[in-house]
């Protein structure tokens, strides 16, 4: 059985929706939880402590232990104070779930760059700020579990969400690097791509889907990702009780000798370039570099 006894978790954006569900479930399984929520509107404006305090009250009433925090996830000083408060009260931080986010949807033609920057700031920079605030502590204790929250908009695209999609794929790149940097300290970093009915998605989902897409149907996946036996560097997709893994593959591709390196030859052989047979999954950028060097060396030997 997966439990979190004596562990300390921070969940951002935990006043509503997915974050609330994650925080309550962690507490039910023994974790001491920092319920972080700025308490702003869906577009990130305003602030209130009411939502975070409400979730803490729910956890307390069920016999759990939690504290509310209203730090803006983009403010390093405020986030550092949040982490310090958790360590002062409970002695450590074992788990960070980066869940906070905002939406400012418009087609790119109509999108103000200020709205682009605001969304990227919360989702991508906010994830980096919160992770930075716990990173040294997790390295020192040789243990940590971190989840970043991505989205189908980042993995596959969604009309009207250029800002959100850019940020959400950005956190996957962030995860891909930290999974390597944290491995020797037993810090495991994974991504969750949820499909759920929350206030963020309320206007995007038909009514008949909302009942199936409760946040609670996603939370079992994130609890696995922050458990002691968690994987490292995976993207777990989840919604309506379904769970899958999204992965990035690169095709085997082709090598062109110098005299054939023209755009016309790339076009002529593009289907061969895209052929998925023999595709592979890399765990670091250096593996891609070595692949092309091997192809070049083999190609030159064949020419000789």
Where are these regions (language model features)?
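The beta1-alpha1 cofactor-binding region of Rossmann-like NAD(H)/NADP(H)-dependent oxidoreductases
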Residues: 49-53, 70-81, 113
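Active-site helix of classical SDR
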Residues: 19, 131, 167
């Amino acid at each position: 059985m997966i439990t979190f006894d004596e562990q300390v978790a921070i969940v951002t954006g935990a006043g509503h929706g997915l974050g609330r569900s994650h925080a309550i479930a962690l507490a039910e399984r023994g974790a001491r939880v920092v319920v972080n929520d700025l308490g702003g509107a869906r577009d990130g404006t305003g602030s209130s402590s009411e939502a975070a305090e409400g979730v803490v009250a729910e956890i307390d009433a069920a016999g759990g232990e939690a504290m509310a925090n209203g730090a803006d996830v983009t403010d390093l000083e405020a986030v550092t104070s949040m982490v310090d408060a958790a360590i002062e009260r409970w002695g450590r931080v074992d788990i960070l779930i980066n869940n906070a986010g905002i939406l400012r949807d418009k087609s790119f033609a109509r999108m103000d760059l200020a709205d682009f920057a605001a969304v990227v700031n919360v989702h991508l920079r906010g994830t980096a700020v919160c992770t930075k605030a716990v990173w040294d502590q997790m390295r020192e204790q040789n243990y940590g579990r971190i989840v970043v929250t991505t989205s189908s908009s980042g993995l596959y695209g969604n009309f009207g969400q250029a800002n959100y999609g850019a940020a959400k794929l950005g956190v996957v790149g962030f995860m891909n690097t930290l999974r390597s940097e944290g491995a020797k300290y037993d810090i495991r970093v994974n991504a969750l791509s949820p499909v759920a009915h929350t206030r963020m998605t309320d206007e995007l989902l038909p009514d008949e889907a909302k009942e199936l897409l409760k946040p609670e149907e996603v939370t079992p996946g994130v609890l696995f990702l922050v458990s002691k036996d968690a994987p490292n560097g995976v993207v777990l997709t989840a919604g309506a009780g379904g769970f899958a893994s999204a992965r990035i593959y690169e095709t085997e591709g082709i090598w062109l000798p110098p005299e054939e390196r023209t755009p016309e030859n790339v076009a002529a052989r593009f289907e061969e370039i895209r052929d998925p047979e023999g595709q592979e999954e890399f765990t670091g950028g250096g593996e891609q570099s070595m692949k092309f060097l091997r192809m070049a060396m083999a190609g030159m030997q064949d020419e000789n």
